[in-house]
Amino acid sequence: MKTNEHDYYSQLANWSFNEINYTSKNYTNWVYENEIKKHTKKDSKILDLGTAAGEKVLKRFPECAEILGTDFSEEMIKVANKNLKESGRKNISFRVMNNLEMDTQDNYYDIVTARHTVTDPKQIYKTLKPGGYLILRGVDKLDCWSLKRMFNRGQAFYDKKPISLVDYEAALNAGFKDVELIPLHVIEYYKTKEDLYALLIKVPILDDLTELKQNEEWERIPIEKDLFEKYVAENTTKKGIKLIRRYYGIIARK
């Protein structure tokens, strides 16, 4: 895990978006949670990497023999365990683990899931049973591209190769078979500019989390009010303030 990413996400104790008012429309059939359900059996063991506060696991993952959710942020895991108690769900646990320094058993899990987080396919391959699946959903380079271009910065803004291709090639190099890469197109509409601003404060859309050189310190650049207002003015529709999202899905078999 890059130091900048660790510091950024460690500051967030709340990964819920319930307070942000928006609607979304998917333009691709592939749905991350549906793929997980499709491959889950009653005796399946699932490892969810980058689980954050566990909301997705608790609300959308199917019942099975065992689910472990991990995150490198202690604050996130504290909230996840609190959410677990309130949910009443069984056979689920949460603990701290760095995705790039996995300490899970070899050949143990039937499915490893990862949503919007850094992964190491070689370590995932080791912890999966033969025939097990990696199911991944990520944020691609062209996500919110018109917004990033207006601010001339943002997550993956200067990357030469899209992260979707990086992850796809990494899965192949790790030894996975039947690796499939699916582009995911979504348009979101935010009810007010305050809702959009709340999103930009919470997630690193406009932040460059590229690792810095030794002794350099990463500081978050404040959102320029004039550029933000310009984007809102140019993208306000009857449905709300438009934000074009670009994600990707990967499913691979060991």
Enumerate the predicted regions with their spans.
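Class I SAM-dependent methyltransferase SAM/SAH-binding core
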Residues: 47, 52-101
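Short, glycine-/aromatic-enriched active-site segment of Class I SAM-dependent methyltransferases
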Residues: 140-159
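A short SAM/SAH-binding and catalytic strip from SAM-dependent methyltransferases
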Residues: 110-122
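Conserved class I S-adenosyl-L-methionine
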Residues: 1-40
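A short acidic, Gly/Pro-enriched loop at the edge of an enzyme's catalytic core
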Residues: 102-111
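A short glycine-rich, Lys/Arg-flanked "PGG" loop and its adjoining helix->strand segment in the class I
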Residues: 121-133
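Conserved Class I S-adenosyl-L-methionine
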Residues: 180-254
